[in-house]
Each structure stands twice: as C-alpha cells, then as structure tokens.
Regions:
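Acidic/polar low-complexity surface segments
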Residues: 126-129, 134-136, 140, 146-153, ...
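Short amphipathic secondary-structure patches
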Residues: 1-26, 112-113, 170, 192
C-alpha cells in the first residue's frame, strides 16, 4: 500500500523530522481488519558543525587524544574541537574537567560525563578529521648551520667554559649577575644545563640570563631563557636539537615570529615553566605566515611539549605539533588575550586545573590564518532520534 511521508524542518532549520506511515496489509475481512491501526515511524536528523576549527587531536591510535583532569577547562565557544582517537576514551573528562565549544566531535567514545561538555552534547563516532596542515610546506631552513652568535655552549656570545674545561666564573660578573639567587645557585644551574639535566634539552644551546634582543636564525641546542628578559626580532627561529625553554621567572616576547622545531632526536620542544612570562604573535608574511610553532613532521623520538606558564595570555597564530603531545598545566588562563589561537597536536594532556582559551577573532587580527585551519568545517548529519 502507498506510504504516507511527512517531513518537517524544526529547531530553527538545524534538524528535519520525518514521519513515515503505512497501512498494514490485512488478510482477514470484516471487524478484525478494521481494528488494525496504521504503522508510523519517526526519525529526526540533526546537522552539527560547519563552524571554525580551532583544536585537533590528530592521532587515531592513542588511548585518549584529549585527556583532561583535575578541573581542566577548554573554552572554544565559537569553534570546533576534534579528537581523532577511535578508542572508547578518545575524550577523557576526569575530576570535574569540562569543555565549552561550538562543536565537540569525537571519533571514538567519551570517558566521563557528557554533561561536562556544553552548550551542545558532544558527538561520538565522528569521522576522523584529516590533518588540515598536512600539505603545508615546512620552512626552507637550508643546511641548518648555526649562524647565530649564540651558538651551543655560549652565553650572550661568550664561551661558557674556560680553558681548563670548567665553568668560566668570570661570566658571573656580567650577564649572569641578573639571575636571582646566589652565585652558588647560578653555577649549579649552569652545570645542570651543561650536563643536559634540563627536560627536553641535552644540548645547552643559547643561554640567556640578562635582558637582550635576539635575531632570527638557527639556534643549535635551542634557546634557554633562565631568568632573562628576551625580545625577539621578527622572523623565523629554527631550533635544531634543542627547544625553547623559559624558566626561573624568564620573559619571552616577540611580534611576527615563528619557531620551526627540528632535529632528528626530537629534542626541540616547548618548555614554558610556571614562573615564565610569554607573549608571542606569528609572522604576517613569508613561509611561516600564521604559524607560531611548526614541528618537523619527521621527528624520531617523542618528548612532550609543556606549557605551564601562568602568564602566557597572548599567543596569536597556529601551533602545529603533529608528532608529539602538548601538556598544559598552568594555573591561570592560557591565550585568553589573543585575537585567535589554533592548536593542532598529536595529543593533548591537560591537568592541574588549566584553562585553555581559543578565540576566533580572525577578522580583527593582523596575523593571517593558515589555509586549512580556522576555516569552516564540513557539516555533520547525524540521526538524533528514531521511534
């Protein structure tokens, strides 16, 4: 018999309710047939997404691509968050962690209360989102020669070791005089750096302890701001087998700067200690336009990037860490004063109550948004109700 179908657009155009009715086929005439009612089936399909993309956990194989604990919070009110892990714990929300986003789309499942995600209920079993920056060329860095004056084993251009192979104590009379603490503590700290005891940096790299301005270039062994105050000139900073470390109350600020993290050992990591102060914006032009941090895709070993700074409120641009985990454990909001921030990482680990704020004021920002991120995501149609 003919089907009777009724379709109705509901929820402000975001959903469609379809009702299908059919009269049953009867084999007995008379009163028995008259008592059989029509069969009706209802279904509602909702459209979600289609907004800006500002946070992606890339790995499909991790137990949890977005792991949040201890009152950790993500505030991305006008953009979408994607977790590509297909595990049942793809998004983990433990100990009062919560997410506020326009869309949360999880390839696997959710461990924790779905009510911790607002204002919309998170979607599970979403198709993983392909890395939107996979075709973005890495910056042209040439042969990675250490062309900066602050090469490995140097402080402000001076030799770190004396002719006898011991720490040059004369340096304590100059730039090191600005380091907090006594002379003994300064010596101990520098010796730790030399021996590679700092997390993420086996090579000492450039060690900055006073107030200075750095030029773009290749920094073999990375840049270590130990209680210093560093202003970066615009350009690309290539960190080869050593990361960007800011600790002991160190300050790092720069406009129109981009960091390319490279080196086969995977030692070029971000290490922002709790006492550090960070303010950075990505380049406006060039092969790093819009890219604040760009991690080499071919790193061999996995060392986490750590953002624990309690004063890193201005991070404008895209942070791209496809091979490693980004750990966020600051006590104060991160990136909340930025025009926009986009983060794409292999995995996110948030604990100890941090609040990550992902703004989307792309139109007002002078920093371009890289193609593939910050753009509108594809809408997702999902069956919401069936009766």
């Amino acid at each position: 018999r003919p089907h009777i179908t009724d379709a109705e657009v509901i929820d402000g155009g975001k959903a469609v309710k379809v009702t299908i009715s059919v009269e049953p086929k009867t084999y007995f005439p008379g009163p028995i047939a008259q008592g059989v009612s029509a069969i009706r089936v209802k279904a509602i399909a909702e459209v979600s997404g289609g907004g800006y993309v500002c946070m992606i956990g890339l790995s499909p194989n991790e137990d949890s691509t977005l792991d949040m604990h201890d009152k950790a919070r993500v505030r991305a009110e006008n953009c979408a968050i994607y977790s590509n892990s297909k595990n049942k714990n793809s998004l983990r929300l433990a100990n009062k962690a919560r997410v506020k986003a326009d869309l949360v789309c999880v390839a696997g499942g959710i461990a924790g209360p779905k009510s911790a995600v607002s204002p919309n209920e998170p979607l599970t079993d979403c198709p993983p989102l392909t890395d939107p920056l996979r075709d973005r060329p890495e910056p042209n860095v040439g042969l990675l020669e250490c062309d900066n004056i602050l090469g490995a084993s140097s402080i402000l251009g001076k030799d770190l070791l004396g002719k006898d192979g011991l720490l040059n104590l004369d340096l304590l009379k100059g730039g090191l005089g600005g380091v907090l603490g006594g002379v003994g503590e300064k010596v101990k700290l520098l010796q730790q750096i030399l021996k590679g005891d700092l997390v993420g940096n086996l090579a000492p790299g450039a060690i900055v302890t006073g107030k200075t301005t750095l030029e773009p270039g290749t920094y073999c062994g990375g840049i270590n701001v130990i209680g210093g105050d560093v202003t970066l000139k615009p350009g690309t900073y290539v960190l080869n087998n050593g990361g960007i470390v800011v600790m002991n109350g160190g300050k790092l600020q720069g406009e129109n700067v981009g960091f390319f993290l490279t080196g086969a050992l995977g030692l070029s990591t971000i290490q922002f200690a709790a006492s550090s102060t960070i303010s950075l914006t990505a380049p406006r032009a060039g092969d790093m336009a819009g890219m604040l941090f760009f991690e080499d895709r071919d790193v061999l070993f996995k060392f986490p990037h750590i953002m624990a700074s309690n004063n890193a409120r201005n991070l404008v641009g895209t942070i791209y860490l496809p091979g490693n985990t980004l750990e966020i454990n600051a006590k104060n909001p991160i990136a909340d004063q930025s025009d926009y921030t986009v983060i794409v990482a292999r995995k996110f680990d948030m604990k100890d109550g941090p609040e990550l704020v992902l703004n989307t004021d792309y139109e007002s920002s002078l920093i371009p948004v890289p193609e593939g991120v910050g753009n509108k995501s594809r809408p997702i149609v999902k069956l919401a109700y069936r009766d």
